[in-house]
């Protein structure tokens, strides 16, 4: 290499070094002069301040700053607490599931949120907080500050609307608005109001970046907003999207809403259905009206149900949804037009219409009609134009305006719907009813029927039936009504009287609204057949029968033991709640008590004490007070009272048993005009007795002794124990029973198979705890009682003897087979040999063997 070449290379190297230093200086200077994204904890003005002049998220961040997932192009230097600094991409997560991971740069959209520092755990270390960017609220408000998000925005008179936003990333980026029409065409620039910007920020409100959320005219709970003029675009549905201007346009950082822009000034009324069952609620919506408007909906008096009261007519429009007021308009006693609430409706002399005042909220006014107060016909409902303070005051109908008769007020829309008559059924009682008995009263009702009344008819009008001291029954939410354990004849009204006598009648159910013919708010005691049938009603035939009485006393072998002195009784008494049970002995002593009848019309009473009676013949009586619930001709009106009369009066003194029984009968079933019922039985009260009636004997030592007997003791309360005793009265085995029927017959089995019993004479003893009885039994050797086989059975083996003989020739017929299968004859021959024995049989076998050998020799010669 020449000196000249070396010099040229040195010059080039110098130029490169100088250029590199210059470039580095320029780069460093550029970084130092870059716009600051913010100074973290001291940050106050936002990315659109005069110091930065940028709207996106590029720039430096300082210690303590909040950064967001998805941010790109951000830088910063952070002290590590040891005198050094690190870049943003070297910060580490302080805690949590992902502790220690690095904060990547650019920041991924799914980077775990939390605190990141240069040197976690070291005092003086610096860092940032990572959050998820979010728009937490997006609301479209009309010029009256009504929320029309997702509904209708009226475009009229160049009134502007606002798109208001709450979000958390104002330190990172501005918000950007995008508006598209229903064809997907972007119309953002067109719909923006004059002077409005398509980008905003919470912290800025100036000519370049106006923020209507900060101008004091809007709800200051919003961070930022955009001003639009709906009159700038055509009618239709528009999609509004708000998101960050650069990086933060994903997930929760972006929010979308729709709005229907219309220029139509006429509101419309839509009904949920054009046909409802009377009593069913009918919902409606008012649409195409600016947010915050108030409209009147009206149903005229001619559409009302005839039997309802004024206070109910005032409830035609339900106080639900967006309804701010409801009531009636008519004339008072002085002839003045007045609007009254339901509570004052009865003060009207005449009624013109029912009204509801409904507010447009969220683009729609929602209301509902209570159709149970309307006639079952075609009903007209009118929607009046929005009130501008002319017919409303404080969102209520003013007092001296009649919308129907005053031509000043026009309707925006009207609709009609059909009201169909509802249905009622009465499912119980049905068929037959025993007077005085308790039954369930139940049935079904159409939706909207709140209460029903029960009526009964003989030949004339329908008479009200009192149900458990009430005149009506409420309908449950599942459209059924039900009352349990009701005595239809037990009330004080005309219908109860009808059902208290045997016969065939009509029982019916009617909507309470149709049972108030004079509209006084209470059901009528009586309805004509026409009045009953013209309402929502249903009726069935019901046959009423008289009370009955059946019963029996439980005795054992016709007796009750004086050791027990207790007796049971059971039976059926339809239509009764209580009965009298009485006992009279031959000496005139009496025991009487009252018992209750169960809901299923049965009665059962155990362990009635009869210890006051003498032994001997006893008569037992079950007495019912009958249909009129009176014993005799008013002798007593209660079972307990009549029982006391029997014990304390009829059985007092020196009366005989017959005299006591006579007094019971003459004051009950035999009294004048009495409808009492009685059941009579007789038994013997005697000493306790348990006897052994039969024992099978003799019995083998491994057999079973069967013991049977009778008793007059009560089972369950007593146990009969049976023992086998040896000749020294030592117990060999024992068993017991506490079950026997009313005939007193009992039985016990003593199993000897597990007992080591020697043959001999033994005793069986039965003991009921108070009484015993014995019988002897002989035990013999096991197997000694087996019967010998009959002589006619002996020949049976002989009849089978010829069978081997008939089978014997079979080997001979098979003998030629050895030509093809030699072993088979040998097997057959051996079988025959084992089967047959006797003199000369061995010689025959030898002969057969010789013949077989000869045949084999001949075969070989051939």
Swiss-Prot record:
Keyword rRNA processing: no
InterPro entries: Csg_halobact (IPR026458), PGF_CTERM (IPR026371), Surf_glycop_sig_pep (IPR026452)
Keywords: Cell membrane, Cell wall, Cell wall biogenesis/degradation, Glycoprotein, Lipoprotein, Membrane, S-layer, Secreted, Signal, Transmembrane, Transmembrane helix
Compositional bias per record (Acidic residues), positions renumbered to this chain: 784-801, 816-833
Signal peptide: 1-34
PTM info: Glycosylated. Cleaved by the archaeosortase ArtA at the C-terminus, with removal of a short hydrophobic segment.
The UniProt record lists the keyword Transmembrane: yes
Residues of this chain annotated as glycosylated in UniProt: 442, 520, 550, 702, 761
Intrachain S-S bonds: none
Motif PGF sorting signal per UniProt: ranges: 839-841
Biased composition (Low complexity): 802-815
UniProt feature, compositional bias: Basic and acidic residues: 206-220
Domain of life from the UniProt record: Archaea
Gene Ontology BP annotations: cell wall organization; regulation of cell shape
Transmembrane parts of this sequence: 838-858
Location relative to the cell: Secreted, Cell wall, S-layer; Cell membrane
Location of region: Disordered: 35-60, 101-126, 200-220, 752-838
GO CC terms of this entry: extracellular region; plasma membrane; S-layer
Comp. bias intervals (Polar residues): 43-57
Family statement drawn from the similarity comment of this UniProt entry: Belongs to the halobacterial S-layer protein family.
Described purpose of this protein according to its UniProt entry: S-layer protein. The S-layer is a paracrystalline mono-layered assembly of proteins which coat the surface of the cell.
Protein name (Swiss-Prot/TrEMBL): Cell surface glycoprotein
Species for this entry: Haloarcula japonica (strain ATCC 49778 / DSM 6131 / JCM 7785 / NBRC 101032 / NCIMB 13157 / TR-1)
């Amino acid at each position: 290499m020449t000196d000249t070449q070396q010099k040229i290379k040195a010059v080039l190297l110098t130029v490169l070094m100088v250029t590199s230093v210059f470039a580095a200086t320029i780069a460093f200077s550029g970084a130092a002069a870059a716009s600051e994204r913010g100074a973290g904890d001291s940050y106050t003005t936002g990315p659109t301040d005069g110091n930065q002049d940028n709207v996106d998220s590029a720039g430096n961040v300082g210690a303590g700053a909040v950064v967001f997932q998805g941010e790109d192009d951000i830088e910063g230097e952070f002290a590590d607490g040891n005198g050094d600094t690190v870049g943003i991409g070297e910060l580490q997560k302080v805690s949590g599931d992902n502790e220690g991971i690095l904060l990547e740069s650019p920041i991924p959209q799914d980077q775990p949120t939390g605190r990141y520092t240069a040197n976690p755990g070291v005092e003086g270390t610096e860092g940032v907080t990572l959050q998820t960017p979010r728009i937490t609220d997006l609301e479209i408000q009309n010029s009256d500050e009504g929320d029309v998000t997702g509904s209708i925005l009226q475009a009229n008179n160049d009134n502007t609307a606002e798109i208001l936003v709450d979000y958390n990333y104002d330190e990172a980026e501005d918000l950007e608005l995008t508006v598209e029409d229903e064809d997907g065409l972007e119309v953002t620039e067109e719909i923006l109001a004059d002077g409005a910007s398509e980008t905003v920020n919470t912290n800025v409100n100036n000519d370049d970046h106006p923020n209507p959320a900060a101008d004091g005219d809007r709800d200051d709970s919003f961070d930022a907003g955009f001003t639009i003029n709906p009159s700038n675009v055509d009618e239709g549905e528009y999609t509004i999207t708000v998101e960050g201007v650069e990086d933060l346009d994903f997930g929760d950082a972006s929010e979308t809403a729709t709005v229907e822009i219309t220029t139509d000034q006429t509101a419309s009324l839509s009904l949920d259905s054009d046909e409802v069952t009377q009593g069913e609620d009918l919902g409606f919506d008012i649409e195409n009206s600016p947010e915050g408007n108030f409209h009147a909906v009206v149903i005229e008096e001619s559409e009302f149900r005839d039997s309802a009261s004024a206070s109910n007519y005032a409830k035609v429009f339900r106080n639900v949804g967006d309804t701010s007021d409801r009531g009636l308009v008519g004339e008072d006693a002085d002839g003045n037009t007045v609007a009254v609430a339901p509570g004052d409706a009865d003060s009207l002399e005449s009624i013109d219409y029912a009204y509801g005042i409904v507010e447009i909220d969220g683009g729609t006014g929602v209301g509902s009609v209570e159709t149970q107060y309307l006639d079952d016909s075609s009903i007209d409902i009118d929607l009046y134009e929005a009130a501008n303070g002319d017919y409303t005051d404080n969102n209520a109908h003013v007092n001296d305006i009649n919308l129907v008769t005053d031509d000043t007020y026009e309707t925006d829309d009207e609709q009609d719907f059909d009201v169909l008559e509802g249905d009622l059924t009465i499912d119980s009682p049905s068929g037959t009813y025993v007077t005085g008995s308790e039954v369930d009263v139940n049935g079904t009702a159409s939706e909207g029927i709140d209460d029903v009344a029960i009526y009964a008819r003989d030949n004339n009008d329908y008479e009200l039936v009192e149900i458990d001291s009430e005149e009506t029954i409420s309908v449950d939410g599942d459209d059924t009504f039900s009352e349990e354990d009701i005595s239809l004849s037990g009330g004080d009204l005309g219908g109860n009287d009808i059902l208290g006598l045997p016969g065939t009648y009509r029982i019916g159910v009617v909507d309470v609204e149709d049972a108030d013919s004079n509209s006084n708010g209470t059901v009528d005691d009586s309805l004509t057949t026409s009045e009953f049938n013209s309402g929502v009603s249903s009726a069935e035939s019901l046959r009423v029968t008289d009370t009955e009485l059946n019963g029996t006393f439980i005795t054992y072998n016709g007796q009750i033991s004086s050791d027990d002195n207790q007796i049971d009784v059971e039976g059926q008494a339809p239509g009764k709640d209580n009965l009298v049970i009485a006992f009279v002995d031959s000496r005139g002593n009496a025991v009487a008590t009252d018992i209750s009848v169960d809901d299923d019309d049965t009665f059962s009473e155990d362990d009635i004490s009869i210890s006051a009676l003498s032994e001997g013949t006893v008569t037992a009586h079950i007495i019912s007070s009958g249909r009129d619930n009176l014993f005799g001709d008013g002798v007593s009106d209660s079972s307990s009272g009549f029982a006391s009369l029997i014990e304390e009066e009829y059985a007092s003194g020196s009366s005989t048993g017959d005299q006591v029984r006579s007094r019971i009968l003459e004051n009950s079933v035999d009294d004048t005009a009495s409808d009492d019922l009685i059941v009579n039985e007789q038994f013997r009260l005697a000493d306790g007795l348990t006897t052994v009636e039969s024992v099978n004997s003799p019995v083998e030592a491994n057999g079973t002794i069967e013991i049977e007997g009778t008793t007059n003791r009560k089972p369950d309360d007593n146990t009969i124990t049976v023992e086998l005793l040896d000749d020294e009265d030592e117990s060999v085995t024992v068993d017991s029973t506490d079950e026997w029927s009313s005939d007193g017959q009992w039985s016990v089995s003593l199993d000897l198979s597990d007992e080591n019993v020697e043959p001999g004479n033994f005793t069986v003893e039965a003991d009921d705890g108070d009484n015993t009885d014995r019988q002897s039994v002989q035990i013999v050797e096991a197997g000694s009682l087996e019967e010998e086989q009959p002589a006619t059975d002996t020949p049976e083996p002989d009849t089978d003897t010829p069978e081997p003989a008939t089978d014997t020739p079979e080997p001979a017929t098979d003998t030629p087979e050895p030509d093809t299968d030699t072993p088979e004859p040998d097997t057959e021959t051996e079988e025959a040999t084992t089967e047959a024995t006797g003199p000369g049989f061995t010689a025959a076998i030898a002969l057969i063997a010789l013949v077989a050998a000869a045949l084999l020799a001949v075969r070989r010669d051939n």
